[in-house]
């Protein structure tokens, strides 16, 4: 998790990457991300949900995910909070396969339900220490 960048960003978007970062290196990663955000910058994270059995099966059978260490949403929130990133919004997403796309319009009502294939978290940089 090497981030040698000398710029600041209003938004950092991390899509299905955290599970490839070793759990022992995640704290340093989020410390660096915090430092890369502008004063009122936001971090948007999109990750696999380890509570979804289909996601677990797909990750287990994917060679690209051989090193994957899935992270629960609550653990992601905790490590971000420890690094002064305040949760603004979160939810679970992708409940139905494409064959059931006629259900896609109601997925927004299930954000609270922990069995979505993925989840998202939106954090804001907390400058108060």
Task: List the model feature ranges, each with a label.
Residues 27-42:
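A short glycine-rich, Lys/Arg-flanked "PGG" loop and its adjoining helix->strand segment in the class I
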Residues 1-4, 21-25, 44-129:
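Class I (Rossmann-like) S-adenosyl-L-methionine-dependent methyltransferase catalytic domain
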Residues 13:
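A conserved beta-strand element that flanks and buttresses the S-adenosyl-L-methionine
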Residues 8-10:
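Local beta-strand N-terminus motif with an aromatic residue
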Residues 17:
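Hydrophobic adenine-recognition pocket in adenosine-nucleotide-binding enzymes
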């Amino acid at each position: 998790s090497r981030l040698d960048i000398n710029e600041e960003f209003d938004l950092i978007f991390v899509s299905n990457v955290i599970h490839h970062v070793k759990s022992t290196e995640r704290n340093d990663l989020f410390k660096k991300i915090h430092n890369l955000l502008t004063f009122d910058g936001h971090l948007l994270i999109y990750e696999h949900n380890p509570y979804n059995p289909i996601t677990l099966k797909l990750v287990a059978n994917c060679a690209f995910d051989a090193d994957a260490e899935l992270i629960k949403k609550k653990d992601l929130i905790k490590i971000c909070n420890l690094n002064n990133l305040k949760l603004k919004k979160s939810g679970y997403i992708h409940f139905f396969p494409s064959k059931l796309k006629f259900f896609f319009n109601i997925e927004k009502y299930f954000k609270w339900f922990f069995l979505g294939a993925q989840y998202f978290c939106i954090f804001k940089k907390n400058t108060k220490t």
